């Protein structure tokens, strides 16, 4: 039997006049994608979005009405009038005339690769290569080779350099000859890598160690040493989290020479002079050896005049500005705060 209720609803829908946007959608659909696609560039972004919305809810358009619509548009002709799947047809037209990114934007979608979460190997790049190398050094060479082969090359190179000279040849050989890895073994390794990343991200995002390090960086070395020793009696783990974030003026002595040169390259003569007042002879010499001869003579001349009338607070501020710059440059990978420890024999 005929569904008269449905028939009546369709009749009422056909009686409703089309809006200008609906007319445009109907004509574009009737043209076919090759012709309609060429016309899309003449519409603005907002107009295209309105036409897409209209096409998705467009009622059935009978041939005689469609003919009348087409007559409203000069120089246009129909290329088939199948309007059964308006949404799909409009998508096809968009793909004909626009780039994939533009189509995705108009349809409110994004390509899978764009929305897909960054892989665990890309996330590793936010970690400290020194710590990653220390963790990997405990693993089997084949595991290390697999992890290095999966890392972004720039980060993998940094990690490789942190591994011992004794380990590198075997790891490189295994990485060169690595073949299909057992999926189960790969899944186990990747699960562990995810755990490491999450642990490191949690530590990095924790405000506690960073805040305590900031406080200690304002103190003198004897005070910091005393506080760390006291903290170590309570929690060795807490000391391990805080100590790497602490960098005092006296620690400049333990920087690699090339890093010292880079650090003081952009520090003004006045700041260096103020920071060196009252400093130990060995530290002073290490800093003066990192600057140009002319600048060194000027600083030595000022220091020879003595420290009379110098405010200790100004000395502390100058030293703090230098250590802050060192921490900043280290965080960006431009220098090293400490010499690498010699490898065990």
From Swiss-Prot:
Annotated site residue numbers, Part of the EHPQR-motif: 174
Molecular functions per Gene Ontology: cytoskeletal motor activity
Keywords (A to Z) from UniProt: Bacterial flagellum, Cell inner membrane, Cell membrane, Chemotaxis, Flagellar rotation, Membrane
GO CC annotations on file: bacterial-type flagellum basal body; plasma membrane
Principal cellular location given in the protein's record: membrane
Signal peptide residues on this chain, from the entry's feature table: none
Pfam families for the chain: FliG_C (PF01706), FliG_M (PF14841), FliG_N (PF14842)
Motif window: Part of the EHPQR-motif: 139-142
Membrane topology, from the record: Peripheral membrane protein
GO terms under biological process: bacterial-type flagellum-dependent cell motility; chemotaxis
InterPro entries: Flg_Motor_Flig, Flg_Motor_Flig_C, FliG_a-hlx, FliG_M, FliG_N
Presence of the UniProt keyword Repeat in the record: no
Family: Belongs to the FliG family.
Record-linked NCBIfam families: PRK05686.2-1
Name under which the protein is recorded: Flagellar motor switch protein FliG
Source organism (scientific name): Rhizobium meliloti (strain 1021) (Ensifer meliloti)
Name of encoding gene: fliG
């Amino acid at each position: 039997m005929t569904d008269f209720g449905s028939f009546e609803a369709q009749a009422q829908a056909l009686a409703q006049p089309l809006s200008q946007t609906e007319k445009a959608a109907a004509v574009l659909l009737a043209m076919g994608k090759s012709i309609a696609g060429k016309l899309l560039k003449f519409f603005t972004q907002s107009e295209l979005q309105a036409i897409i919305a209209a096409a998705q809810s467009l009622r059935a358009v009978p041939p005689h009405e469609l003919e009348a619509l087409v007559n409203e548009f000069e120089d246009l002709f129909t290329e088939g009038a199948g309007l059964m799947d308006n949404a799909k047809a409009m998508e096809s037209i968009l793909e004909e005339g626009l780039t994939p990114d533009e189509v995705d934007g108009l349809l409110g979608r994004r390509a899978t690769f764009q929305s897909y979460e960054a892989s665990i190997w890309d996330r590793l790049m936010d970690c400290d290569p020194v710590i990653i190398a220390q963790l990997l050094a405990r693993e089997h060479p084949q595991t290390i080779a697999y992890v290095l082969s999966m890392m972004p090359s720039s980060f993998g190179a940094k990690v490789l350099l942190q591994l011992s000279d004794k380990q590198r040849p075997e790891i490189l050989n295994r990485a060169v000859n690595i073949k299909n890895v057992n999926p189960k073994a790969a899944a186990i390794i990747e699960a562990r890598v995810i755990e490491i990343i999450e642990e490191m991200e949690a530590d990095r995002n924790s405000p506690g160690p960073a805040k305590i390090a900031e406080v200690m960086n304002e103190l003198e070395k004897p005070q910091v040493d005393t506080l760390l020793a006291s903290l170590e009696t309570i929690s060795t783990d807490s000391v391990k989290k805080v100590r790497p974030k602490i960098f005092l003026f006296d620690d400049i002595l333990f920087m690699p020479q090339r890093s010292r040169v880079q650090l003081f390259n952009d520090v003004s003569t006045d700041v260096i002079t103020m920071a060196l007042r009252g400093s130990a002879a060995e530290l002073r010499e290490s800093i003066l050896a990192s600057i140009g001869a002319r600048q060194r003579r000027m600083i030595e001349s000022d220091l020879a005049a003595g420290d009379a009338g110098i405010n200790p607070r100004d000395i502390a501020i100058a030293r703090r500005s230098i250590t802050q710059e060192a921490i900043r440059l280290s965080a960006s990978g431009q220098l090293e705060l400490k010499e690498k420890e010699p490898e065990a024999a």
